[in-house]
C-alpha cells in the first residue's frame, strides 16, 4: 500500500527533468555624455507604457443587437462578446454592468485568457476581479496543453479557481487514453500548483493508481514534488526502484533527492544540487548505500563541479569525484547508463586568468584509479601542482607568434605498495613563430620553434637499484629546435557523380618536418605516450602525445591527397576520398622505454572514404595498411541505411592489431563487429537492438580466456505506440563490466503524453547505442499564450 501511494504521488507530480536556469543580468553600455549645447533625444511621455489598474482597463462590446445604457448596464444579444486587452468573453446573450464589471453569460459561454479557453452553457463573473462561477465547464489549458471537464467551477481571481467533479487529461487525442478523475481540484496558476483530492488515474478506462491527496504543476514550469518513479532489474543489484523528489528552491538553483531500493543490496539515498548565477554555475551529486547486503560495507560516490568568473579576466573551477571502492560503478551502475567502464575519477581544482594575448592557470590535478582485478592499470601521475602560461599574437605584421610554458610537479600513487616510477618536477617552454600565406586555391605556412625542457627527478635509488636507475642524474635538460613547412592547393572543376551535376575538388597537401636528434634516454616519462597514426597526426610535430617527455627526431615529408564531390545545387558532400603517407629521410633514434625504433623508409598507408550517394545510405571507411608486411594495422568500415522515419540499420567493423609484447603505451588490439537496428515490426510495434561481438581469439590462458570471442554488449527492446497519448517500452541490456564479468539490466516504461513516464527512460541509452535512432513520439512544439486567438 505504501508503494502504491508512492507511485500515485509521482504519477501526478509531473515536474519532469528540468535544468536549473538563472536570469543572466546584462549590463547596458553607457552612452557618452552629450556636449554642451548639443541636441538631446528624449522619449515622449506619450510613448511610455503605463500599467492601468484592472478596473480602468477599457472594454469593447460587440453583438448583433445591443440595448441598455452604455454607462451602466448593457445587454448584448446574438454573437455577443466583451473584449479587453487581457481577455475575451463570448456567449449568446451577455448582460454587462460597466460600473461594477459584472458579466452574466447565457448560452454558449466562452472565455479566453492567457491561452486558456473555458466553455460552458452559462457563466457569471466579474471582468475587473476575474471572479465568478461557471456551470459544466470545459477547459483547454494553454499553459500545460491539457483539457478538463467539471460539473462546476468557482473562479476566485485571475490565477485561482476550484473545480468540482473533475476529469483531466493532457492527452491531445479526441478520445484520451489516460485521464484523471477527482472530487475537487484547486488550481493556482501563479504558484504553478494544482491540488487534487480523491484522485484516480485511469488508463484505457481502467483505474491503475489512486490517492486521496496529490499535487501537480499546472504550467510547463518547474515545481516541487515527486517525479516519476524509475524501476527495473539488474543481475548485479536485483530489482531496482527509485522515487525522486524535486525541490524548486529558487529560480536559479534546485535539489533532487532520490530514495532508491536495490533488492540485492539495500536502500540507497542519492541527491543532485544544481545552481546557476551571474558568473557562476555548478552541480553536486552523491549517493550513499549503508551496509551493502552483498559486501557488508558502506558504498558511496560523489562528484562536484563548479566554475566561477571572478572579474578582470580571473576565473576558478573544480571537478572533484570519488567512490568508496574500485567496484562501485560495476556493482551499482545506473539503469541504462554503462558507468561500469569508469576507470579514472578526477580531483582537479584550478584558478586562471585570461586576456587578449595571455592565458594562464594554476591547478592541482589528481586521480582516483578504479582497478579491475582482471586487468590492473598503472595509476597516472598526479600534477601537484601544474602552472600553465600561453601568450599568442596572430597576424602581427603577417606573423603568428605563440609561447607556451608549463611547470609541473609529478607524483604517482603506489600500486599494491610498490613504486611504479620516479617522481619529479618538469619545466617546459616552447616559443614558435609562423608566417601563414593564404591565397585563393593555395596556402603555405612556414613555422619555427624551440622547445626547452628541464627535469629535476626523484629516482628513489634504493627502490630502483635492481634495474640500474641509480646512475641517472637528478637534473637534466633538453633543447630541441623544430621546423616545419605546410603547403597545400585546392583545384575545382565541374563534374558529375552517377549522372548528377557535381563540383569535384582535388586537394594535395605536403608537410615537411625537421627535428634534430637529442639524446633523451635519461629523461623520465610522466605523461607521454605514442600517438595513433592518423590523418590528423600525420601533420603534427611529434609522434608522441601528452606532455612531450619525448620529442622524436624527424626529417620527413607527409604527402596527402583528398578529392571531394559536392552536390552542384546544395554544396552537400556526396563523396570524399583521402590518402596519406609519410616518407622518412632519417631513422628513428628517440624512443619510449621498451619501444622498438622505426627503421622503415615509409610509414603505413592511410586511406579513407565517406560516401552519401543517396539521402538514405551513408558509408565510412578508414584504414591503415603496412606495406612492409602486407597487413592491415587498423581499420573501420561502417554503413547506415535510413529509408524512412523510425527505420534505420547500422553495421560497423573495427580492427586494430595487438601491440608488440611488453608494450604498454599502445592501445589493446580490437576485432569487433557491431549491428544496430530500429525497425517497424507490425503497425504500432517497433523493434530496437544492438549487438557488439568481439572476434578476438586468444591463447588458452586464464587471462586470455576472458577476452576470447564474446558479446561485449547486447541491447534488445520493443516499443509500442498506442496512439497519440501513450507509448510502452521494454528494453533488455547486457554489457561487460570488466574483463571477465557482465551485468544484465531489464527495465520497462509507460510514457503518458502530457503526464510523464512511469519507469526508467531508455531513450538516452538508445540514442547512444543506435545511430540515427528516433523516438516514436515526435517532440511537441512549445505552446505560447498566443497559441489560440479569437
Swiss-Prot record:
Gene Ontology terms: biological process: Gram-negative-bacterium-type cell outer membrane assembly; lipopolysaccharide transport
Signal among keywords: yes
GO CC annotation, single: transporter complex
Localization, UniProt: Cell outer membrane
Gene3D superfamilies per UniProt: Lipopolysaccharide (LPS) transport protein A like domain
Pfam families registered for this protein in UniProt: LptD (PF04453), LptD_2 (PF19838)
InterPro entries assigned to the protein according to its UniProt record, in alphabetical order: LipoPS_assembly_LptD, LptD, LptD_2, LptD_C
Keyword terms, alphabetized: Cell outer membrane, Membrane, Signal
Record's keyword annotation contains Coiled coil: no
Leader sequence segment: 1-20
Subunit structure: Component of the lipopolysaccharide transport and assembly complex. Interacts with LptE and LptA.
UniProt family annotation: Belongs to the LptD family.
Stated role: Together with LptE, is involved in the assembly of lipopolysaccharide (LPS) at the surface of the outer membrane.
Listed name of the protein: LPS-assembly protein LptD
Amino acid at each position: 500500500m505504501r508503494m502504491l501511494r508512492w507511485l500515485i504521488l509521482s504519477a501526478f507530480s509531473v515536474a519532469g527533468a528540468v535544468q536549473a536556469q538563472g536570469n543572466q543580468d546584462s549590463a547596458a553600455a553607457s552612452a557618452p555624455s552629450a556636449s554642451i549645447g548639443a541636441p538631446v533625444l528624449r522619449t515622449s511621455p506619450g510613448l511610455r507604457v503605463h500599467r492601468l489598474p484592472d478596473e480602468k482597463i477599457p472594454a469593447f462590446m460587440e453583438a448583433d443587437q445591443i440595448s441598455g445604457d452604455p454607462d451602466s448596464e448593457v445587454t448584448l444579444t446574438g454573437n455577443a462578446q466583451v473584449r479587453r486587452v487581457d481577455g475575451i468573453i463570448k456567449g449568446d446573450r451577455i448582460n454587462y454592468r460597466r460600473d461594477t464589471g459584472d458579466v452574466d453569460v447565457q448560452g454558449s459561454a466562452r472565455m479566453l485568457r492567457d491561452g486558456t479557453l473555458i466553455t460552458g452553457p452559462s457563466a457569471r463573473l466579474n471582468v475587473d476581479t476575474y471572479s465568478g462561477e461557471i456551470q459544466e465547464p470545459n477547459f483547454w489549458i494553454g499553459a500545460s496543453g491539457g483539457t478538463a471537464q467539471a460539473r462546476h467551477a468557482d473562479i476566485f481571481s485571475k490565477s485561482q479557481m476550484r473545480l468540482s467533479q473533475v476529469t483531466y487529461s493532457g492527452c491531445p487525442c479526441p478520445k484520451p487514453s489516460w485521464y484523471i478523475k477527482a472530487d475537487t481540484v484547486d488550481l493556482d496558476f501563479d504558484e504553478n500548483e494544482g491540488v487534487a483530492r480523491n484522485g484516480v488515474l485511469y488508463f484505457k478506462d481502467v483505474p491503475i493508481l489512486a490517492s486521496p491527496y496529490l499535487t501537480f504543476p499546472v504550467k510547463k514550469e518547474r515545481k516541487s514534488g515527486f517525479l516519476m518513479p524509475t524501476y527495473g532489474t539488474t543481475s548485479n543489484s536485483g530489482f531496482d526502484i527509485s522515487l525522486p523528489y524535486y525541490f524548486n528552491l529558487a529560480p536559479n538553483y534546485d535539489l533532487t533527492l532520490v530514495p532508491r531500493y536495490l533488492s540485492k543490496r539495500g536502500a540507497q539515498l542519492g541527491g543532485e544540487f544544481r545552481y546557476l548565477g551571474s558568473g557562476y554555475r555548478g552541480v553536486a551529486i552523491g549517493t550513499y548505500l549503508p551496509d551493502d547486503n552483498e559486501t557488508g560495507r558502506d558504498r558511496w560516490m560523489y562528484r562536484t563541479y563548479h566554475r566561477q568568473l571572478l572579474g578582470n579576466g580571473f576565473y576558478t573551477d573544480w571537478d572533484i569525484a570519488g567512490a568508496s571502492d574500485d567496484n562501485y560503478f560495476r556493482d551499482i551502475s545506473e539503469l541504462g547508463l554503462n558507468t561500469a567502464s569508469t576507470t579514472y575519477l578526477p580531483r582537479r581544482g584550478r584558478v586562471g586568468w585570461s586576456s587578449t594575448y595571455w592565458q594562464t592557470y594554476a591547478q592541482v590535478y589528481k586521480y582516483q584509479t578504479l582497478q579491475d582485478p582482471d586487468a590492473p592499470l598503472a595509476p597516472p601521475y598526479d600534477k601537484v601542482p601544474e602552472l600553465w602560461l600561453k601568450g599568442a599574437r596572430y597576424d602581427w605584421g603577417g606573423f603568428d607568434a605563440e609561447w607556451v610554458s608549463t611547470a609541473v610537479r609529478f607524483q604517482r600513487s603506489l600500486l599494491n605498495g610498490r613504486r611504479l616510477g620516479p617522481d619529479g618536477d618538469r619545466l617546459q617552454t616552447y616559443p614558435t613563430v609562423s608566417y601563414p600565406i593564404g591565397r585563393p586555391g593555395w596556402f603555405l605556412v612556414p613555422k619555427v620553434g624551440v622547445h626547452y625542457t628541464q627535469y629535476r627527478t626523484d629516482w628513489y635509488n634504493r627502490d630502483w637499484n635492481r634495474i640500474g636507475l641509480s646512475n641517472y642524474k637528478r637534473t637534466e635538460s633538453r633543447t630541441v629546435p623544430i621546423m616545419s613547412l605546410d603547403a597545400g592547393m585546392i583545384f575545382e572543376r565541374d563534374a558529375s557523380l552517377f549522372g548528377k551535376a557535381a563540383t569535384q575538388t582535388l586537394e594535395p597537401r605536403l608537410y615537411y618536418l625537421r627535428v634534430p636528434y637529442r639524446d633523451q634516454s635519461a629523461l623520465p616519462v610522466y605523461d607521454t605516450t605514442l600517438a595513433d597514426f592518423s590523418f590528423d597526426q600525420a601533420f603534427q610535430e611529434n609522434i608522441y602525445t601528452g606532455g612531450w617527455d619525448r620529442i622524436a627526431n624527424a626529417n620527413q615529408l607527409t604527402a596527402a591527397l583528398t578529392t571531394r564531390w559536392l552536390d552542384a545545387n546544395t554544396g552537400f558532400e556526396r563523396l570524399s576520398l583521402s590518402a596519406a603517407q609519410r616518407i622518412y629521410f632519417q631513422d628513428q633514434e628517440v624512443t619510449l622505454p621498451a619501444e622498438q625504433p622505426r627503421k622503415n623508409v615509409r610509414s603505413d598507408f592511410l586511406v579513407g572514404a565517406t560516401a552519401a550517394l543517396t539521402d538514405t545510405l551513408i558509408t565510412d571507411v578508414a584504414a591503415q595498411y603496412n606495406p612492409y608486411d602486407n597487413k592491415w594495422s587498423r581499420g573501420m568500415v561502417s554503413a547506415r541505411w535510413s529509408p524512412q522515419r523510425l527505420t534505420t540499420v547500422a553495421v560497423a567493423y573495427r580492427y586494430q592489431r595487438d601491440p608488440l609484447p611488453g608494450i604498454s603505451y599502445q592501445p589493446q588490439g580490437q576485432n569487433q563487429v557491431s549491428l544496430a537496428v530500429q525497425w517497424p515490426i507490425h503497425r504500432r510495434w517497433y523493434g530496437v537492438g544492438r549487438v557488439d561481438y568481439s572476434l578476438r581469439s586468444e591463447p588458452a590462458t586464464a587471462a586470455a580466456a576472458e577476452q576470447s570471442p564474446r558479446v561485449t554488449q547486447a541491447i534488445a527492446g520493443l516499443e509500442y505506440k498506442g496512439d497519440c497519448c501513450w507509448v510502452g517500452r521494454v528494453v533488455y541490456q547486457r554489457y561487460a563490466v570488466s574483463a571477465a564479468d557482465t551485468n544484465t539490466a531489464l527495465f520497462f516504461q509507460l510514457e503518458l503524453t502530457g503526464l510523464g513516464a512511469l519507469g526508467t527512460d531508455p531513450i538516452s541509452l538508445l540514442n547512444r547505442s543506435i545511430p540515427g535512432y528516433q523516438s516514436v513520439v515526435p517532440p511537441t512544439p512549445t505552446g505560447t499564450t498566443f497559441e489560440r486567438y479569437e
